[in-house]
Amino acid sequence: MSEIPAELYYTDEHEWVLRTGDDTLRVGITDYAQAALGDVVFVQLPDVGAELTSGESFGEVESTKSVSDLYAPVSAKVLAVNGNLEASPDLVNSDPYGEGWLVDLQLDADDMEAALGGLLDADGYRGVVTE
């Protein structure tokens, strides 16, 4: 069974979201997603400062099996990208909830609760992966 940490939020598209501050979030792909992808060989991420729209593609994860789009869990600005993935894309496999994070996002603090409210909790995501 895939690891699904209770403190994170999730999307139907297998991204996880961690609230890191009043107006900031960290995003990655779930353990379930990395296992389904297989060995990750390349990660394409947006530029810092890019504006992401909830539900729209913001990058790609390429594995030995396939190429999968990454979808923005919320509408926000890219604050940082994980530069370590350029040389070590396999971090997505070995540590999807830690060193394998993808992007840090910033949104208006007033919009945070509504944005997180649109995401799944661990139990909701568990329902998605066991269907």
Swiss-Prot record:
GO BP terms, alphabetized: glycine decarboxylation via glycine cleavage system
N6-lipoyllysine: residues bearing it: 65
Gene Ontology cellular component list: cytosol; glycine cleavage complex
Highest taxon in the source lineage: Bacteria
Protein biosynthesis found in the keyword field: no
Residues in the signal sequence: none
Lipoyl-binding domain mapped to chain residues: 24-106
Key words, A-Z: Lipoyl
Co-factor note (free text): Binds 1 lipoyl cofactor covalently.
Annotated InterPro entries: Biotin_lipoyl, GCV_H, GCV_H/Fam206, GCV_H_sub, Single_hybrid_motif
Cofactor requirement: (R)-lipoate
Self-association and partners: The glycine cleavage system is composed of four proteins: P, T, L and H.
Family to which the UniProt record says this protein belongs: Belongs to the GcvH family.
Record's function text: The glycine cleavage system catalyzes the degradation of glycine. The H protein shuttles the methylamine group of glycine from the P protein to the T protein.
Stored HAMAP family: GcvH
PANTHER family named in the record: GLYCINE CLEAVAGE SYSTEM H PROTEIN, GLYCINE CLEAVAGE SYSTEM H PROTEIN-RELATED
Full protein name: Glycine cleavage system H protein
Record organism: Mycobacterium sp. (strain KMS)
